[in-house]
């Protein structure tokens, strides 16, 4: 669900930023309206498909006979709010694209705060259990989506969500081409989780599956911060690229690389230094804590170099360079990580699954740096030629 929201939101918002930089407000508003139409259409389609296939999908992601009932109860209700999730995640990008980061942050806090308040009420006071958590989530996403739509439709928004623009048209093509990279990066997480779970179950057992879940959950915290940097810097890159202010583009790109590489290195270093402490947040099992303690430093070893790819991806999407962004997304996950996770365990056992991550991270970071350098030089030379 999140991946499809990124396909439209993370593809449309940078396109809108570029058009704003060019002073083309009408086209930016058409991009916004078209994105809203497709977000709703995709949400309705996903709701129908996932409701029909929820049990096999949940089992593919690791649900067992012991917890499948709870998972089905949650997802059945959660999917009712798919359209709200799509609109919240997808359209909030267009608020950030205007440089209104406080409003965008408020949109997130409204949903999070509502969920925090309603969760204990529905779960414990009303005794709805896991169903209560799902209901709270749907209500929270509904409130967030209404807040975002009201803002975008108001005069406070630099680009307005107008009913006349909410329709399907060919503007979707450049949106999809640019959104394909973040879509691939997120949708392949599903594939990676399946590959990891199957391999860990085969070569290690339940404790290794649990350990990987803990490690990836902690890495999500790192990803949230790095994605936050990306959402903050990307509109600046896009706007100035559209305005052909390459000096400001250069400054923003420098900040993007420094922020991504530094934050990735510092955060994963903390995780690698105190893995047992973080593991104890999730479990009291000494076996699982022991596995996390051994494997966390291995798993995160390549993230410092991977910060180069995050910086490059941020800059390339911000400048509307779809082909290069898509290649980098495919290279890391599909070309590198999946084959390594499938083959390394044959030679070195379960450790190979954890080792696949840093190898693919470091390799893709180096490739991304080279690709970005070549692309950026080409763009700056083309801009210099136009200015002569």
Briefly describe each language-model feature range.
Residues 91-99, 119-128:
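Membrane-water interface regions at transmembrane-helix termini and the short interhelical loops
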Residues 9, 78-96, 104-115, 133-148, ...:
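Short runs within selected transmembrane alpha-helices of multi-pass transporters and secretion channels
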Residues 77, 111, 140-144, 148, ...:
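Transmembrane helical elements of multi-pass membrane transporters/channels
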Residues 12, 53-54, 91, 118-119, ...:
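Hydrophobic/aromatic residues in alpha-helical transmembrane segments
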Residues 16-81, 125-180, 237-302, 343-388:
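Short alpha-helical transmembrane segments in multi-pass integral membrane proteins
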Residues 1-48, 85-104, 211-275, 306-328:
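Small-residue-rich hydrophobic transmembrane alpha-helices
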Residues 3, 115-120, 145-149, 220-224, ...:
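Hydrophobic transmembrane alpha-helices of multi-pass small-molecule transporters
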Residues 4-5, 45, 49, 79, ...:
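Residue-level hotspots within pore-lining transmembrane alpha-helices
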């Amino acid at each position: 669900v999140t991946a499809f929201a990124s396909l439209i939101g993370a593809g449309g918002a940078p396109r809108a930023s570029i058009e704003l930089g060019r002073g083309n407000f009408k086209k930016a508003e058409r991009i916004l309206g078209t994105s809203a139409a497709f977000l709703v259409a995709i949400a309705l389609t996903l709701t129908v498909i996932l409701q029909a296939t929820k049990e096999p999908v949940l089992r593919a992601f690791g649900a067992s006979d012991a917890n499948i009932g709870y998972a089905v109860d949650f997802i059945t209700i959660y999917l009712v709010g798919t359209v709200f999730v799509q609109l919240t995640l997808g359209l909030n990008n267009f608020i950030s694209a205007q440089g209104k980061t406080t409003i965008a942050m408020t949109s997130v806090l409204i949903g999070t705060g509502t969920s925090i308040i309603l969760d204990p009420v529905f779960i414990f006071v009303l005794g709805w259990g896991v169903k209560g958590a799902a209901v709270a989530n749907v209500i929270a996403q509904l409130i967030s989506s209404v807040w975002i739509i009201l803002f975008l439709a108001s005069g406070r928004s630099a680009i307005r969500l107008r009913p006349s623009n909410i329709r399907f048209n060919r503007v979707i093509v450049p949106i999809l081409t640019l959104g394909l990279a973040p879509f691939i990066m997120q949708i392949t997480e599903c594939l990676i989780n399946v590959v990891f779970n199957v391999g860990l179950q085969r070569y290690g057992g339940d404790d290794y599956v649990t350990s990987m879940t803990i490690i990836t959950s902690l890495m999500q915290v790192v990803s949230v911060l790095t994605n936050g940097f990306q959402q903050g810097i990307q509109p600046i890159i896009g706007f100035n690229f559209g305005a052909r202010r390459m000096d400001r583009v250069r400054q923003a790109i420098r900040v993007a690389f420094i922020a991504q590489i530094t934050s990735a290195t510092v955060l994963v270093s903390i995780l690698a230094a105190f893995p047992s402490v973080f593991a104890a947040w999730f479990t009291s099992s000494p076996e699982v804590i022991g596995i996390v303690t051994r494997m966390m430093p291995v798993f995160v070893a390549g993230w410092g170099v991977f910060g180069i790819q995050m910086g490059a991806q941020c800059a390339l999407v911000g400048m509307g360079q779809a082909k290069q962004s898509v290649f980098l997304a495919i290279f890391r996950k599909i070309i590198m990580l999946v084959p390594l996770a499938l083959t390394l365990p044959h030679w070195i056992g379960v450790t190979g699954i954890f080792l696949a991550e840093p190898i693919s991270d470091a390799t893709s970071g180096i490739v991304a740096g080279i690709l970005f350098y070549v692309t950026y030089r080409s763009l700056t030379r083309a801009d210099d030629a136009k200015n002569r």
